[in-house]
């Protein structure tokens, strides 16, 4: 599989080496400082086409990366346009089945009283996944060459809940809630300390560091594969990441103004 990029460049290229370079920018990267690892190189001009592998390494896709053109000035590379993301990531999805949409009636369910919810003939159910409990012990999961330890107690609970609902024809929506994480602190927003519950209940996910980004990806990969409806654990049809993300009480990210926060 390949990623294709088309670049139109013009203007004064004096001071450069006459070439345009394509760089990958990962979510935790902001600029090209000190970098020389460009993906492709071509001539400055109109309708220049580049391609490079979708896979960055074994099992590691570039789906979440952005790509920028740059020129070489002296010994450094400088971006010459805004970053762009892959515009059709859905074509590489393993599961191309249409989403389940059995009706309008739905509830955010309590796992202890599923019978009551099902007796109301619900068609949709919201299931909370507390991500501060996700990592733990009992299940080993290897993702992008790293093995993560996952809390089997939580997964057993989710297995029972999701399977019961989806086997009953209910479309399950999982809501990933990131309370302060003592087990895997890299999931907590950078530069933020835990606040009293009356000030913040949940926190935004940290994808500003490589460790946080990879932990979030590993968690998403495990959950998506386990609850794809094809391996006996039930199916999660929809995913909600965070809660009330425009409100710092429910999705705390630190001391930002509105513009920076959004």
Predicted regions and their residues:
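Mature N-terminal, pre-catalytic/accessory segment of carbohydrate-active enzymes
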Residues: 1-112
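Active-site cleft segment of glycoside hydrolase catalytic domains centered on the general acid/base Glu
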Residues: 187-262
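Short, solvent-exposed loop/turn and secondary-structure capping segments
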Residues: 117-119, 136-137, 177, 183-189, ...
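Catalytic domains of carbohydrate-active enzymes, especially glycoside hydrolases
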Residues: 104-138, 160-177
């Amino acid at each position: 599989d390949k990623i294709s990029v088309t670049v139109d460049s013009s203007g004064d290229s004096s001071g450069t080496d006459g070439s345009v370079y394509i760089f990958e920018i990962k979510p935790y990267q902001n600029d090209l400082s000190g970098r020389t690892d460009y993906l492709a190189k071509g001539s400055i001009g109109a309708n220049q086409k580049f391609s490079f592998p979708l896979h960055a390494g074994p099992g590691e896709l570039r789906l979440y990366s952005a790509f920028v053109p740059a020129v070489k000035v002296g010994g450094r590379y400088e971006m010459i346009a805004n970053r762009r993301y892959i515009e059709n990531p859905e074509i590489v999805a393993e599961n191309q089945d249409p989403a389940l949409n059995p009706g309008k009636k739905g509830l955010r369910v309590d796992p202890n009283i599923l019978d009551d919810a099902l007796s109301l003939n619900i068609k949709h159910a919201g299931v909370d996944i507390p991500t501060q409990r996700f990592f733990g012990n009992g299940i080993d999961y290897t993702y992008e060459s790293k093995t993560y330890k996952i809390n089997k107690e939580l997964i057993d609970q989710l297995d029972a809940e999701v399977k019961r609902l989806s086997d009953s024809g209910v479309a399950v929506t999982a809501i990933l809630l990131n309370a302060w994480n003592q087990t895997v602190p890299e999931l907590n927003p950078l530069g933020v300390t835990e606040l009293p519950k009356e000030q913040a209940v949940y926190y935004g996910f940290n994808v500003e560091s490589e460790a946080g980004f990879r932990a979030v990806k590993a968690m998403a990969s495990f959950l998506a594969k386990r609850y794809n409806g094809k391996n006996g654990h039930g199916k999660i049809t929809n995913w909600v990441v965070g809660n009330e993300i425009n409100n710092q009480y429910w999705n705390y990210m630190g001391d930002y103004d509105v513009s920076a926060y959004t």
